[in-house]
Regions:
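Secreted/periplasmic proteins
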Residues: 2-123
Length: 123
């Protein structure tokens, strides 16, 4: 194994993960604003563009679109949840503000890979 191969593998491993190969999904979203540690070990920053998802890999990035107003934001998955029936993703307060559903508390969203490789539209 060459030093160049090892360096290339290390660089690839450090790149932000995309939810590659993931399908577009639609469902409920809510928001939360804790300051405790997330499943990834980092402290939750309520204003960061982050989210909790039950199965997407930690560190992956997804585009979330609010289906009621078509606003979108790219978030990084850094936590696990939500654990409420009918909810697919829990967004940080900052992401929810950008999506325009703070006062409602929840909304219906489309979740797709941030790289645009999603396979369908929920609208």
């Amino acid at each position: 194994v060459t030093a160049a191969a090892l360096m290339g593998a290390a660089m690839l491993a450090s790149l932000p993960a995309q939810a590659a190969g993931a399908k577009t999904t639609c469902g409920g979203a809510s928001w939360y604003a804790l300051t405790s540690r997330t499943a990834s070990g980092e402290r939750m920053n309520p204003m960061a563009m982050t989210a909790a998802h039950k199965t997407l890999p930690l560190g992956s990035k997804v585009k979330v679109t609010n289906l009621s107003n078509r606003r979108s934001v790219v978030v990084r998955i850094n936590d696990r949840g939500p654990f409420v029936k009918g909810r697919m993703i829990d967004l940080s307060k900052g992401a929810a503000q950008r999506l325009g559903f703070i006062s409602a508390g929840h909304t219906r969203v489309q979740i797709e890979p941030a790289d645009g490789s999603g396979t369908r539209d929920c609208a």
